[in-house]
A protein has these predicted regions:
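Ferredoxin-reductase
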Residues: 2-85, 141-143, 170
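FNR/FR-type flavoprotein reductase catalytic core
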Residues: 3, 72-223
């Protein structure tokens, strides 16, 4: 039987329009890798599960667990918004293998919406190890107000880091001209694509049409 871990809510924050961050205690025996996800269950004792898979938005070195989500009227989201400091929840063991491939290639993140969640600990790790290679983040949202962690993303202390917010309400979407303008070499990069199914399909088509090697990009679907 898979182990279940007990959590307690520390705080709930609004981090963008219609977007909430939940910060929980982290059990001493809970371990995970950057880029993994878990199932967060916010049901009360005796209730059926009210759970959802969420990427872990905190770094393994932190003594908390952070999750971030768009608000909706689903049972899970409604319960999350009702939670108060000290309320309990549970999580499963972390799973997933969406992680770095370190090489001499530029790291390129192509992200939309709440797909930014696992990117935060990735950037924290690059900052921690004093990464010297080039890192470019292209982050697509309809407006600035919907851009989760915008201020934090501007302030990572990574030597060759470039943050490129894309506001599709007033700008063209991420396209090959933008990539060619911002990247040293589109063919000498490792791409990490996270977002909705439609966003992923668009980004994969963009890379395929420009003959980017399939081995040079990794995909994580946020539904």
């Amino acid at each position: 039987m898979k182990k279940i871990y007990d959590l307690s809510l520390i705080e709930r924050n609004y981090v963008a329009e219609n977007t909430v961050e939940l910060i929980f205690t982290k059990p001493d025996d809970y371990f995970f890798k950057i880029g993994q996800y878990t199932f967060l269950d916010v049901a009360h004792k005796g209730e059926n599960k009210i759970a959802r898979a969420l990427s872990i938005a905190s770094h393994p070195d932190e003594d908390i667990l952070r999750f971030v989500m768009r608000i909706s009227d689903s049972d899970f989201k409604t319960r999350c918004l009702e939670m108060k400091k000290g309320d309990s929840a549970t999580i499963t063991q972390a799973t997933g293998n969406f992680g770095f491939k370190f090489s001499d290639k530029e790291i390129v993140f192509l992200i939309s919406g709440i797909g930014i969640a696992p990117i935060i600990p990735m950037l924290m790790e690059l900052e921690k190890i004093n990464y010297q290679g080039k890192v470019s983040l292209f982050y697509s949202n309809r407006t600035l107000a919907k851009t989760t962690y915008h201020e934090r993303l501007q302030n990572f202390n990574i030597k060759n880091y470039n943050y490129n917010p894309v506001f599709t309400g007033i700008q063209p979407r991420i396209n090959i001209n933008l990539l060619k303008e911002k990247l040293d070499d589109i063919y000498n990069s490792n791409y990490y694509i996270i977002g909705t199914s439609d966003f992923i399909k668009t980004m994969k088509t963009l890379l395929e049409e420009n003959h980017i090697d399939r081995n040079h990009y990794l995909v994580d679907n946020f539904g």
